Amino acid sequence: MWFKNLQIYRFTRPFEQDADALEKLLDGMAFTPCGSQDISKFGWVAPLGRGTQALVHEAAGQLLLCARKEEKMLPSSVVKDMLDEKVEALEAEQGRALKKKEKEALKEEILVTLLPRAFTRHSQTFLWINPADGYVAV
């Protein structure tokens, strides 16, 4: 694991959480994958990979954490094309232009239909905390 765009920050107050206390805090915010109608999800995962359960890795007083974000990729052009097709068909069927609220309802219906089939993209952000010197690297 290498940091790609390393940002280092200094704490303004002493960092007083130990690994166990931090683990308890993060446990309620553990990562869960996107459901069928979720657009994105964020949470904490084990920094050492899938073989471990600990959300905080401690070594020589240093702490390592990993945040994971999952997003569903639904190109707006696909939604727009489907919306245009449905609007065109309904306008031809009803013989009138659809109102803005009707178009928005159609768009929501299309999103509900497409979200379960959308591809997902994952990203991970590692945090290294040096409590003794008061640094956090992201």
Model segments located where?
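N-terminal alpha-helical "arm" segments
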Residues: 1-22
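Short, flexible turn/loop "capping" segments at secondary-structure junctions
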Residues: 1-2, 58, 129-131
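Short cationic amphipathic helices and targeting signals
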Residues: 7-9, 64-66, 134-138
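Generic structural motif
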Residues: 14-16, 70-72, 132
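Surface-exposed, low-hydrophobicity interaction/linker segments
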Residues: 20-51, 59-126
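Internal, conserved structured core segments that host functional sites
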Residues: 123-137
